[in-house]
A protein has these predicted regions:
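Short glycine/threonine-rich loop-to-helix capping motif typified by GTGT followed
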Residues: 41-46, 205-215, 247-253
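Short acidic, glycine/serine/threonine-rich loops at helix termini
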Residues: 12-14, 72-75, 130-135, 206-211, ...
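Glycine-rich phosphate-binding loop
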Residues: 54-67, 222-265
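Glycine-rich phosphate/diphosphate-binding loop of Rossmann-like nucleotide-binding domains
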Residues: 1-15, 19, 144-237
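Short, ordered loop/turn segments at secondary-structure junctions
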Residues: 5-6, 34, 65-66, 200-202, ...
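N-terminal glycine-rich phosphate/adenylate-binding segment common to multiple enzyme folds
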Residues: 37-153, 260-264
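N-terminal alpha-helical transmembrane segments of multi-pass membrane transport
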Residues: 8-13, 17-43, 51-54
């Protein structure tokens, strides 16, 4: 699947195909134009179509795309402020983004004690990238409400506002977290590297703690013996402790992060 992009990436990708690919191979791709203008013309349907095609064919090349902000609205005469194509595609694929640095002699890392690559494993679903936000106009309360199919409700007060503010709702799925955990454990076994996982479960006692619990349950039930045989380990710690440990380490491991944490890292 070929996903074209915006601005200079369109020119560079065209040159890559003309000079490096087409002269040597028969390039048979399913093409989708994810340029902002075409996304606007199709009401962003092209983004969803490209993701579904990727699920079908199992491999894709995506060029860089513009995620519009308020300034882009008049510039491109947009119908609405379309969401991030990357976020949409990741949510549909429900995958894990593995970012492994390329180590090159002569290019020294900023942290001198880093000797081996540190691979970031980023959950590709949910969190702030599938959020719902509101601007609170004035005094009142914001509540989090779950309504089951049988009509039962769970209600939690988010905040009692004395004046204007903002509120945000995020979510995740246990099935997606389980897929994320297994992909991280399998990648660690394939590459024979230790796996770290970090959240802030001491503060987020239900959301983040669910991530921690699912990882541990799957590790104990499915991967502990395999890790022991491979001579590697799974290690959990708080996200702030993980950052400190990373700065002191030599590298050579996989660091699994929730969606936003992985984006930052």
């Amino acid at each position: 699947v070929e996903m074209d992009g915006d601005e200079m990436t369109r020119i560079l990708w065209k040159m890559i195909k003309e000079h490096l690919l087409n002269p040597f191979i028969e390039l048979n791709t399913d093409y989708y134009d994810l340029g902002l203008e075409h996304r606007n013309e199709t009401n962003d349907q092209v983004t969803f179509d490209s993701a579904e095609a990727t699920k079908k064919y199992k491999v894709a090349v995506k060029c860089a795309t513009i995620t519009p902000n308020a300034a882009r609205m008049p510039e491109y005469n947009l119908k609405e402020m379309w969401k991030s194509p990357n976020g949409t595609i990741r949510a549909i694929l429900d995958g894990t983004v593995f970012r492994a640095p390329i180590v090159v002699k002569g290019i020294e890392p900023c942290v001198k004690n880093w000797k081996k690559p540190i691979t970031i494993a980023r959950h590709a679903y949910g969190d702030v990238y599938k959020n719902t936000e509101i601007k609170v106009p004035g005094p009142g309360k914001v509540e989090l409400v779950y309504t089951g199919d049988d009509g039962t409700q769970i209600k939690e007060l988010v905040h009692k506002y004395d004046g204007p503010g903002v509120a945000q709702g995020i979510h995740n799925l246990c099935g997606s977290i389980e897929s994320f955990a297994r992909s991280c454990f399998n990648y660690a076994l394939d590459t024979k590297q230790d796996l770290w996982f970090a959240t802030k479960d001491t503060i987020s006692k239900k959301y983040d703690h669910t991530f921690k619990d699912i990882f541990q349950e799957i590790f104990d039930a499915e991967y502990k013996e395999k890790f022991d045989e491979a001579g590697i380990e799974y290690f959990y710690t708080l996200i702030d402790d993980a950052v400190a440990r990373v700065m002191k380490s030599e590298g050579g491991y996989i660091w699994a992060c929730k969606n936003y944490d992985g984006d930052v890292m």
